[in-house]
Amino acid sequence: MAVAYADKPNHFINFPLTQFQGFVLNYKGLQFQLLDEGVDCKIQTAPHISLAMLDIQPEDYRSVDVAIQEVIDDMHWGEGFQIKFENPHILGRCIVLDVKGVEELHDDLVNYIRDKGCVADQSRKWIGHCTIAQLTDAALSIKENVDFINNMQFNYKITINPSSPARLEIVKLGAERKDGFYETIASHWMGIRFEYNPPTDKLAMIMGYCCLEVVRKELEEGDLPENDDDAWFKLSYHYENNSWFFRHVYRKSSYFRKSCQNLDCNCLGFYESSVEED
């Protein structure tokens, strides 16, 4: 089957960099050099890495959102990984830094998003980069500007591990920027997101098949398979591995949340009294 490409993209997967203060300090130093030299350019105010271009519609947001969470949950951190920024140069009309260390993350995002039936990545080869500024046509034609840019130096590394402030976001092309960040459709911290820890090793210790229909009614249509065996397997797997779907159900279903908190099945009488949140 032919692969569909986002050659006319309307969204992208964003890796924001503003929260990495050491990087931003050095990044702004480059921008100040350009301004001091009098290079006519538009400064980038939201430093970031575009990890994948997308051609999606609003009805695809949830699928892409889930794909991002799955990529994060399936990451093998080890000692973490480094992102290297170097070699300021001109790419098209932009002044950019080469970015190394996120190639595997790019590939995973594209593959997971495509697995959801959404269009990701372009037909041309993806080049990891971070834009510093955009040149005007006049500035691009001045040899002194080009020579100055080609002689600029930059070398910086960011270490990404589970405690880093790294995030993956869905951003619409042309989105507003504020305080160094893009307005996002969805944004997820990349760390090991044990915000909702399972209270026991086995879901069966607190729930039975009789509870599934109650949980299903509180979720969005299609979240849990209609077949109880399939639904039980899906919920149990994600519960025991503390994966994205367990946290989704925990947030969406007050009944499931209360069952986890009580370490017991309380489906009998659920409709007789309201569930109070702790």
From Swiss-Prot:
Pfam families to which the protein is assigned, alphabetical: Corona_NS2A
Cited InterPro entries: Coronavirus_NS2A (IPR007878), NS2A-like (IPR039573)
Domain of life assignment: Viruses
Similarity remark: Belongs to the coronaviruses ns2a protein family.
Protein name (record): Non-structural protein 2a
Organism whose genome encodes this protein: Bovine coronavirus (strain 98TXSF-110-ENT)
